[in-house]
């Protein structure tokens, strides 16, 4: 993947998954969670000592958890979004690094939202990785300053 090391970790068992993450990422600078759909334990986060970025397929704090496109569609949103944030032990609650949005209309169906959202997720994650790896993010309380 463009020369970037990639490791797949199953999310079947949280304890086993977290052990695999530690084993496979000993030399990494940043851990990226994409479609992991699990909350990392506070023990893991306190010992990992490196940035952990999660990409969520909604404009947080709206539509946390699973199936945000379905939630957004059922609410008739006018904007669809993606959020890259630091992972915490609380679901989709970490400090937000980057967000991207795009307008949608009543003509868009769930598949349209997913397609547009996937594009936003890629842009959002790339910008977040770039900002974090270039040390351009400062965390203060549960907020970030990105410069």
PLM features: residue spans?
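One-carbon transfer enzymes
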Residues: 1-147
């Amino acid at each position: 993947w463009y020369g970037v090391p990639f490791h797949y970790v199953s999310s079947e068992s949280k304890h086993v998954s977290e052990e695999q993450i530690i084993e496979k990422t000993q030399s990494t600078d940043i851990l990226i969670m994409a479609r992991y759909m699990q909350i990392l334990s506070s023990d893991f986060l306190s010992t990992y000592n490196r940035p952990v970025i999660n990409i969520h397929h909604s404009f947080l704090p709206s539509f946390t958890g699973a199936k945000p496109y379905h939630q957004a569609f059922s609410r008739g949103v006018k904007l669809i979004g993606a959020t890259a944030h630091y992972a915490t032990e609380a679901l989709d609650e970490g400090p937000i690094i980057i967000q991207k949005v795009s307008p949608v209309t009543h003509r868009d169906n769930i598949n349209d939202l997913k397609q547009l959202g996937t594009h936003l997720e890629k842009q959002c994650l790339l910008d977040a990785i770039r900002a974090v790896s270039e040390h351009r993010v400062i965390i203060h309380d549960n907020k970030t300053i990105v410069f």
